[in-house]
Amino acid sequence: MKRIIAGILIALCVGCAGPVFVTRPIEDEPSLLVGLASYNDQSKATAIRHDHPVEWSKADLHAILKRLFIQEGGGLMDSARPRQAVFSPEDMTSLIPSLHKTFKIAQPSDWIVFAIWGSSGKSQTLEVTSGGMFLEDQRLHIIVANHRERVSSAKDGIHAIRSNPFHSLSDVKGGLIFFQAAMSLIHETAGSSVGSNPR
């Protein structure tokens, strides 16, 4: 596995509306969006210098994604919620080929963005997981804006996120993301992201 994986930095981004992006879909299906996003403001876009393009093997991407776990925050009086995998096996089956292709064509000013819609529970409520990734200083940054967030309407849950996968549907609630390899916390934030992430 690439040495780069040892330098993973991860953040949970919740409740942040984010700046104005242009999203260019690479894979655009009813239940999946993978694409490239950059600042709409060209002066901001040219200031971003991510380490793209880059080629990840599908095996490396699978090894990273399957080890990401989230423990979402609750209220002050709530007990700790159990850890959940960020991506289901079905999510990874859909995501990995598209991420593999998209990282290879991403430019330094781009973020790789994703959104996956699915149903869960007896009610088959529509949910979305969305966010983005970028490579900087030989470290992969992963931003999770929504994690299995219930979609209340087509406008909020589908159209808004297709326009900007960094758009969060919920209020700031914080959370922890873990990389299972060491089962230790790599990074924790609430309402923000790591490094030179979108602001």
Feature map (PLM): residue ranges:
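Early exported N-terminus immediately downstream of N-terminal targeting peptides
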Residues: 31, 38-90
